[in-house]
Design a protein with these regions (language model features):
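Gly/Pro-rich hinge or "lid" segments in bacterial periplasmic/extracellular proteins
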Residues: 75-78, 200-248, 252-341, 346-350, ...
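Structural transition elements
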Residues: 302-303, 415-416, 448-493, 514-523
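N-terminal lobe/hinge region of extracytoplasmic solute-binding protein
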Residues: 42-110, 297
Length: 745
């Protein structure tokens, strides 16, 4: 063998351990990340909007609510949930007025109240984050107003990349801009229908915005491609908010509504600086791809530093955040972490692996791993496996204030409407859709069947449903009615054995946006098997997501599956309003959350009564009546309430599950020393492949050297023959161009 080749082999053998030591690192984070005050977590759903006026998904709120701030918040540890001031000096107290302007004392009846005022007083230490929108010249104009794209920084990826940033205090006018903006019909704010029924002047405000847009050449439904028209929300008349001075303003309702305080803890009420709207309307900023939809401006503990929804979203500590103390960690100021990293993980298993390696600080448990990670203790409660406990992991379980339901379009002539026959059909389907079985198969038992729309833990939750699963006193739980009862209801509905009067089989259609999803395919097969029990054929009508949303808004669908609602606030009204006719999605032109378009005069009357009442026995009685009407009419198969199972590592401090607030990141602390130790322990490189490679290379080099030093027999053959002998001895094969091409192929 050529001595040079032997030398190379020995060099590789000598350098292999060093190379492995330097390069063998499976961490997804940069060097030093484990020792930094960074909270690492993940998300799996697409982030569509971080605009406070339109964002309404849980995973978006987990990001947005740590950047922008609402006037109120929930106490992090208190249960039942308790409101606390956030931007305000105190929780506002309502003042009730009669039609003649007389101040009403105590708690007047709703019918005597014509006006409600809440006085909100801002703290004096509130400032927005550093942002280019606040950079002003001596005249008060944006210094970027006359900037063209060529003058902007190259490779612009964030507002934080602009050369000049500035800030300012919060003003009451910012809250007016925020609320008036909710009235803009172009935004289709998801809570507009509910808010406008109470906040004075919202409907008039919406009409004035629409009128201004039309006067300026706006055609409804057709936004200009490049620069949408910017309405000056500051100048639009709005009677629902009155600015008093630099620190006070009034929120004004047209009727009594005790639950209005819960609104003030939602990001829809976060202040909106006019400068931000102006900035994101500039042509070069639009051309750069920056928008309020992706880059919110707030006063919260964090600001958005990196926005790459397909890879990573990163928040950094807001240097302008006020000094805020917390009783849970006396003497320490919030937030406790410098950064929050949200990493996009499409699949659950890679996320689970990284959590077990210590690279994520929290994680759910994939369905495939639930049996390995958990077990049931002697009390029948879910607990961590012994191995997970020994690794110092902690388990947090709770039934979430959420409902997922199977919905019927009440505008559809076959499954909807108020006729007795169609109601029997909906009840029959509700009986055969055994959601305990669904939970066991698809959720690994993590959830409870819903008996109505209100989840456990919120007053008014139903224990049973007399029309579908009545209470069994002997068993102490609700029991689903037998299949024979469902078949009897099908007979009453005019579909004996699923056959219509014309002799054709009853076929229903499920509209969805889950084409290609393997989980949905399995769930749809489950649905087909259940519908077949009563002779109904069900077919799917898949749509692209935006098309499916259009179908919901126009009522062009028949059945929907796994539509969900998570509580905005801990009150039964927040679930019952999903069936108030005024919130019908079609009737409200997409603004209402009554997706099934249910309408009942009897239910509406009860709802209007209970929504304005304080929480007392009389109100509870009305809630029970309203729930029974919904159970009887069955606009939905009530589905299930999911359980949330979260694992955390021992180094994560102060973690407490909170189902009402998403602004809780500031409370989380990291024991960076322990995290780094555990990551090093759990991710030691495997040494045996290195040793095996070293041994193999050493043996190869040894025998090669031995063969090199052995004298060859004397021969009179020419050097060409000797070369041929050596070539055959070591099987040296010249590599031709053709060989390389074939290998590459």
């Amino acid at each position: 063998m050529n001595k040079t080749l032997i030398f190379v082999i020995l060099a590789i053998a000598a350098g292999l351990p060093l190379a492995v030591t330097l390069c063998c690192n499976n961490s997804p984070w940069p060097d030093g990340a484990a020792s930094s005050k960074t909270f690492f977590t993940s998300f799996s759903s697409a982030v569509k909007s971080l605009d406070p006026a339109t964002s309404y998904y849980v995973h978006e709120s987990a990001i947005l609510d740590n950047i922008v701030e609402a006037p109120l918040d929930y106490d992090y540890l208190e249960r039942p949930y308790k409101l606390i001031p956030r931007l305000l000096t105190e929780i506002p107290v309502p003042q009730y007025y009669a039609a003649d302007g007389t101040l009403l004392a105590d708690d007047p009846p709703p019918e005597s109240v014509q006006r409600v005022e809440y006085l909100l007083t801002l703290r004096e230490d509130l400032r927005y984050q550093q942002h280019p929108c606040f950079a002003r010249d001596v005249r008060g104009h944006s210094i970027y107003a006359d900037t063209n794209s060529m003058q902007l920084p190259k490779n612009l990826s964030s507002p934080q990349d602009f050369p000049v940033l500035d800030s300012r205090p919060l003003h009451p006018m910012d809250f007016k801009v925020a609320l008036v903006r909710l009235c803009d019909p172009r935004l289709a704010c998801p809570v507009y229908a509910n808010l406008s029924s109470f906040i004075d002047g919202m409907e008039e405000c919406s009409r004035k915005i629409q009128q201004e847009l039309e006067e300026r050449g706006f055609e409804s439904g057709h936004l200009p491609q490049r620069q949408p028209l910017l309405v000056d929300y500051r100048t639009i008349p709005f009677s629902g908010l009155e600015v008093i001075n630099n620190h006070q303003f009034k929120l004004i309702l047209s009727r009594k509504y005790p639950q209005a305080l819960y609104w003030l803890a939602m990001h829809f009420f976060a202040p909106m600086p006019w400068e931000a709207l102006e900035f994101y309307h500039l042509a070069p900023v639009i051309d750069s791809g920056l928008s309020l939809k992706n880059w919110p401006v707030g006063s919260g503990p964090y600001l958005l530093q990196e926005m790459n929804p397909a890879v990573q979203i990163r928040l950094c500590r807001n240097s302008n955040f006020r000094k805020e103390l917390w009783d849970g960690a006396p003497g320490q100021t919030l937030p406790f972490t410098e950064q929050i990293v949200f990493q996009y993980e499409r699949e659950a298993i890679p996320n689970w692996i990284k959590f077990n390696q210590g690279y994520y600080d929290t994680s759910g448990i994939p369905s495939d791993m639930l049996d390995a990670a958990t077990s049931f203790n002697s009390s029948g409660e879910l607990a961590l496996s012994q191995e997970m406990q020994e690794r110092g992991m902690l388990l947090h379980c709770s039934v979430t204030p959420t409902v997922f339901y199977f919905g019927f379009n009440m505008l559809d002539p076959v499954v909807g409407g108020s006729s007795e026959q169609n109601r029997f059909l909906r009840q029959a389907i509700s009986i055969v859709l055994d959601y305990q079985e669904f939970i066991d198969i698809f959720l690994n038992g993590q959830g409870v069947p819903a008996q109505g729309v209100i989840p456990p833990g919120i007053s008014g939750a139903c224990k049973a449903n007399e029309f579908i699963s009545p209470w069994d006193e002997q068993l102490g739980k609700p029991v689903r009615l037998p299949l024979q009862k469902a078949r009897e209801l099908m007979q009453k509905a005019g579909y004996p054995n699923g056959i219509a009067q014309d002799g054709s089989p009853l076929t229903l259609y499920l509209d969805h946006a889950n084409a290609g999803a393997s989980v949905f395919k399995a769930q749809f097969q489950w649905l087909k098997s259940k519908f077949a029990l009563i002779g109904i054929q069900i077919e799917e009508r898949p749509s692209e997501l935006n098309r499916w949303r259009d179908k919901l808004q126009t009522g062009n669908w028949q059945l929907i599956f796994n539509k969900g609602w998570l509580a905005d606030y801990p009150d039964p009204e927040n679930f019952l309003f999903l069936f108030y006719s005024g919130n019908g999605t079609v009737q409200s032109k997409g603004r209402g959350a009554n997706y099934v378009n249910y309408s009942s005069a009897e239910f509406d009357q009860l709802f209007r009564q209970l929504e304005t009442m304080p929480d007392n026995i009389n109100r509870q009685s009305l809630i029970e009546q309203a729930c029974r009407i919904l159970q009887k009419d069955a606009p939905c198969c009530w589905g299930y309430h999911p359980a949330k199972v979260i694992l955390t590592h021992k180094w994560l401090n102060h973690y407490t599950p909170h189902d009402m607030s998403y602004s809780t990141m500031k409370y989380l602390g990291i024991n960076t020393v322990l995290r780094e130790q555990k990551q090093n322990l759990w991710n030691r490189p495997s040494r045996w492949p290195i040793c095996a490679a070293l041994i193999a290379l050493s043996f190869f080099a040894f025998f090669a050297l031995r063969g090199q030093n052995k004298p060859l027999p004397v021969s009179n053959k020419s050097n060409d023959v000797r070369h041929d002998l050596l070539s055959r001895t070591f099987s040296v094969k010249p590599v031709t161009d053709n060989t390389m091409e074939n290998t590459a192929q």
